[in-house]
Amino acid sequence: MAPNLRKSHPLLKMVNNSLIDLPTPPNISAWWNFGSLLGICLMTQILTGLLLAMHYTADTTLAFSSVAHTCRNVQYGWLIRNLHANGASFFFICIYLHIGRGFYYGSYLYKETWNTGVILLLTLMATAFVGYVLPWGQMSFWGATVITNLFSAIPYIGQTLVEWAWGGFSVDNPTLTRFFALHFLLPFMIAGLTLVHLTFLHESGSNNPLGIVSNCDKIPFHPYFTLKDILGFTLMFLLLTTLALFSPNLLGDPENFTPANPLVTPPHIKPEWYFLFAYAILRSIPNKLGGVLALAASVLILFLAPFLHKAKQRAMTFRPLSQLLFWVLVANLFILTWVGSQPVEHPFIIIGQLASFTYFTILLILFPIIGALENKMLNY
């Protein structure tokens, strides 16, 4: 009998073991769809990005008009650009839901998988930031100026670091050129890290909604979850195309329709919606270095999740107090996102400070305490 090529071929064997014959818990819910959705997002972004890069010019005098030219004169250029810009939003929606799922069900106890995931998030944030600068509109320019300027808060080496990043004494042509190079490079780095992420995941196997070992009860990934994933893809593409075709500028900033002008500062400088929660935390501290540290901590705190887990049960499925706290944290993140989009004035300043304080308190103090309390409750 001839050997099964899918199981014997050196390359196909790897694909088979990760996408076809992969033993999967039978009870994973739709919350487990977001990993594959992120993969599809990445592929879509690389494809649309490549097509956009073919028509883009990374020069301060031409960048804005080259993007306008793509939208006006290139076949379906407007569609490619809208899919790429809104695809970034969907990428972040998926990654935030994916992280939320991991947090709720205790998936962070697979430390290597979790840590590579956090590194992926940081790389994605860097990619989105440098990408937002490329159209060279007002918000692109001032966003780049404000965020890169934060590095100057680092003691001793800060100013040198910023000038080195800018390639001069302000955000200018060298900055745009290197940001384009980075924006082209980073997605491939994300793709590489994704393989590392999956390698670590397949060492342990997937977690499941009950947070218990399911080795005795697994089913093959194909056809069950391939079909389930295709349903997820269809729904996401439906939402993405609807957004890109009906209201492509809904999530963008109108300020970015004005070409970059270093002499005119926009009234409210704010990043894209997916960074607003971190931006609100940055603004809530009146000291520059303190704000930068809080901004970094807001994302890096995810690395601490495995060490702050004090509960005997893995998932929050049967832990009502932790569930309540989790949803308070989610609501808190929505408040931070909203505050980040508002001007720096009363009452938004105090709301932002309270929400930032609550964010860190919940993650660092309340979750471990509630976990330990629930352990005590198991005895009664």
From Swiss-Prot:
Cell cycle in keyword set: no
One cellular component term from this protein's GO annotations in UniProt: mitochondrial inner membrane
UniProt GO MF annotations: metal ion binding; ubiquinol-cytochrome-c reductase activity
Swiss-Prot/TrEMBL GO biological process terms: mitochondrial electron transport, ubiquinol to cytochrome c
Gene3D superfamilies named among the record's database cross-references: Cytochrome Bc1 Complex, Chain C (1.20.810.10)
Binding site for heme b b562: H84, H183
Compartment(s) of residence: Mitochondrion inner membrane
A Pfam family hit: Cytochrome_B
Keywords tagged on the record: Electron transport, Heme, Iron, Membrane, Metal-binding, Mitochondrion, Mitochondrion inner membrane, Respiratory chain, Transmembrane, Transmembrane helix, Transport, Ubiquinone
Keyword Transmembrane in record: yes
Its job: Component of the ubiquinol-cytochrome c reductase complex (complex III or cytochrome b-c1 complex) that is part of the mitochondrial respiratory chain. The b-c1 complex mediates electron transfer from ubiquinol to cytochrome c. Contributes to the generation of a proton gradient across the mitochondrial membrane that is then used for ATP synthesis.
Summary of subunit composition and partner proteins: The cytochrome bc1 complex contains 11 subunits: 3 respiratory subunits (MT-CYB, CYC1 and UQCRFS1), 2 core proteins (UQCRC1 and UQCRC2) and 6 low-molecular weight proteins (UQCRH/QCR6, UQCRB/QCR7, UQCRQ/QCR8, UQCR10/QCR9, UQCR11/QCR10 and a cleavage product of UQCRFS1). This cytochrome bc1 complex then forms a dimer.
Family in the record: Belongs to the cytochrome b family.
Name of the protein: Cytochrome b
